[in-house]
Amino acid sequence: MNLRPLHDRVIVKRLDQETKTASGIVIPDAAAEKPDQGEVLAIGPGKRDDKGALIALDVKVGDRVLFGKYAGQTVKVDGQELLVMREEDIMAVVNAK
């Protein structure tokens, strides 16, 4: 991937959501109101505070994150659709069990 985010921006690959329930009922995309999930592919160096000190990001490459339906900007890189968003658009990091 030849995309390097700047400042507090994060590159996220959207993960497919479950479209079927455990009982086999198919859920249409319009009815699924869950936040989207994705994997962090790259992060910027962070943003600067008022004194110019760099504040590192809380997310790391490889983290699985939750974000809102309209978060970020979609870009196409090497035939793959990715999202570029600010770290503040990320709602949570999903911890593996």
Swiss-Prot record:
Domain of life, per lineage: Bacteria
> What is this protein for, i.e. what is its function?
Together with the chaperonin GroEL, plays an essential role in assisting protein folding. The GroEL-GroES system forms a nano-cage that allows encapsulation of the non-native substrate proteins and provides a physical environment optimized to promote and accelerate protein folding. GroES binds to the apical surface of the GroEL ring, thereby capping the opening of the GroEL channel.
Could you provide one GO biological process annotation from this protein's UniProt record?
chaperone cofactor-dependent protein refolding
Q: What is this protein called?
A: Co-chaperonin GroES
GO-annotated cellular components: cytoplasm
Self-association or partners: how does it assemble? Heptamer of 7 subunits arranged in a ring. Interacts with the chaperonin GroEL.
Q: Which family does it belong to?
A: Belongs to the GroES chaperonin family.
KW Cytoplasm (keyword) present: yes
Q: Where in the cell is it found?
A: Cytoplasm
Q: Which GO molecular-function terms appear in the entry?
A: ATP binding; metal ion binding; protein folding chaperone; protein-folding chaperone binding; unfolded protein binding
| Species of provenance | Burkholderia vietnamiensis
Establish whether keyword Plastid is in the entry. Answer: no
* Disulfide bond entries: none
Which PROSITE patterns did the record assign?
CHAPERONINS_CPN10 (PS00681)
- What InterPro entries is this protein classified in? Chaperonin_GroES (IPR020818), Chaperonin_GroES_sf (IPR037124), Chaprnonin_Cpn10_CS (IPR018369), GroES-like_sf (IPR011032)
Q: Which UniProt keywords apply?
A: Chaperone, Cytoplasm
Q: What is the lineage of its organism?
A: Bacteria, Pseudomonadati, Pseudomonadota, Betaproteobacteria, Burkholderiales
Q: Which Pfam families match?
A: Cpn10
